[in-house]
């Protein structure tokens, strides 16, 4: 699992940052990529990476401001040009209006896609759930309807304790599979084995939370609780003047983001959606000003790739679920 930041700026493209789009690379987990927001020129940014548009199976749209959606029609069209077919559908999760926006752009431009396009209008709670991942959405507080997302990887089953089985002279074969599945197995010599005694502890799945355009609100902590990575908008830095601008425009400051990460007990905070003013010394200060609140903080740059590793120490009862 990796995060690739295709755009880390806010409002409009700048010389150093494109507008918002983040790829969650799940190539090992499900041979797929998920995008979170698709700002203008996202597909140009993708050309600078190893990402393949055909691998994108889901797009999550936080809200309908242009710097988060103007890249959608072009990306969808290019995905079609690059050979996506009826067996490679794409699902877009977003607020009311995203379907109308996309369909209008495709209709007016007479663009016909070669693959199925599915729309899911966001509601609070679980918006996607399968055997490997669950996605939870919650409303944010912005100038228009806006959403945050919590991506939960399902826990990984524990490993079969093969050395223990061999030490007890238990023959390999179908029995191993039954024990790994947690079943009780009767051996020819009369022994009865409980699979749970021969499987190591489950490995906790990873959690990544995306908080994009919003002012501070209680749902942020709910979505970010015990997250491995919290990706949080930081349109403005620390300071009273910045705080006033953030309140006026319904955005967050770097201090807001750090406080949210601390309260939620997240592992890492990544700041994104930066105003174009933050370059040079101001950019350095953006991080240094908040590390006393949340030390494990970094600022994303365009095309950064961040690994989200599995934890080595695991617990079946870890209360990280919302």
Swiss-Prot record:
Any single GO molecular-function term of the entry would be: 3'-tRNA processing endoribonuclease activity
Q: Which cofactor does it need?
A: Zn(2+)
What reactions does this protein catalyze?
Endonucleolytic cleavage of RNA, removing extra 3' nucleotides from tRNA precursor, generating 3' termini of tRNAs. A 3'-hydroxy group is left at the tRNA terminus and a 5'-phosphoryl group is left at the trailer molecule
- According to its UniProt record, this protein's enzyme class is hydrolase
The UniProt record lists the EC number as: 3.1.26.11
Q: Where is the active site?
A: 67
Q: Does the keyword ATP-binding apply?
A: no
Report the co-factor binding details.
Binds 2 Zn(2+) ions.
- Keyword entries, A-Z: Endonuclease, Hydrolase, Metal-binding, Nuclease, tRNA processing, Zinc
**The keyword Zinc appears for this protein:** yes
Tell me which residues bind Zn(2+) 1. Answer: 63, 65, 142, 213
The family this protein is said to belong to: Belongs to the RNase Z family.
- NCBIfam families linked: PRK00055.1-3 (NF000801), RNase_Z (TIGR02651)
Q: Which HAMAP family match?
A: RNase_Z_BN (MF_01818)
Give the protein's biological function: Zinc phosphodiesterase, which displays some tRNA 3'-processing endonuclease activity. Probably involved in tRNA maturation, by removing a 3'-trailer from precursor tRNA.
Tell me the subunit arrangement. Answer: Homodimer.
The identity of this protein, by name, is Ribonuclease Z
């Amino acid at each position: 699992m990796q995060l690739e930041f295709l755009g880390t700026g806010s409002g409009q493209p700048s010389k150093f940052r494109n507008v918002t789009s983040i790829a969650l690379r799940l190539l090992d987990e499900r041979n797929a990529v998920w995008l979170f927001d698709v700002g203008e020129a996202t597909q140009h940014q993708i050309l600078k990476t190893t990402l393949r548009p055909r691998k994108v199976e889901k797009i999550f749209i936080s809200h309908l401001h242009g710097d988060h959606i103007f890249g959608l029609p072009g990306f969808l069209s290019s995905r079609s040009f690059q050979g996506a077919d009826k067996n490679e559908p794409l699902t877009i999760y977003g607020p009311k209006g995203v379907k109308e926006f996309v369909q209008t752009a495709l209709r007016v431009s007479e663009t016909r896609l070669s693959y199925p396009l599915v729309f899911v209008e966001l509601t609070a709670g679980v918006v996607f759930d399968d055997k490997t991942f669950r996605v939870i959405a919650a409303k944010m507080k912005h100038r228009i309807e806006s959403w945050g997302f919590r991506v939960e990887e399902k826990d990984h089953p524990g490993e079969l304790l093969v050395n223990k089985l061999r030490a007890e002279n238990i023959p390999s074969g179908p029995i191993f599979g039954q024990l790994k599945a947690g079943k009780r197995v009767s051996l020819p010599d009369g022994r009865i084995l409980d699979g749970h005694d021969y499987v190591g502890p489950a490995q906790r799945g990873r959690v990544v939370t995306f908080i994009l355009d919003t002012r501070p609100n209680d749902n942020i902590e709910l979505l970010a609780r015990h997250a491995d990575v919290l990706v949080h908008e930081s349109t403005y830095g620390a300071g009273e003047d910045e705080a006033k601008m953030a309140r006026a425009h319904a955005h967050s400051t770097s201090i807001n983001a750090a406080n949210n990460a601390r309260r939620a007990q997240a592992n890492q905070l990544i700041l994104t959606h930066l105003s174009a003013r933050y370059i040079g010394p101001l950019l350095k200060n953006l991080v240094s000003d908040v590390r006393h609140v949340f030390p494990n903080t970094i600022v994303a740059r365009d095309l950064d790739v961040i690994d989200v590793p599995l934890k080595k120490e695991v617990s079946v009862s870890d209360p990280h679920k919302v």
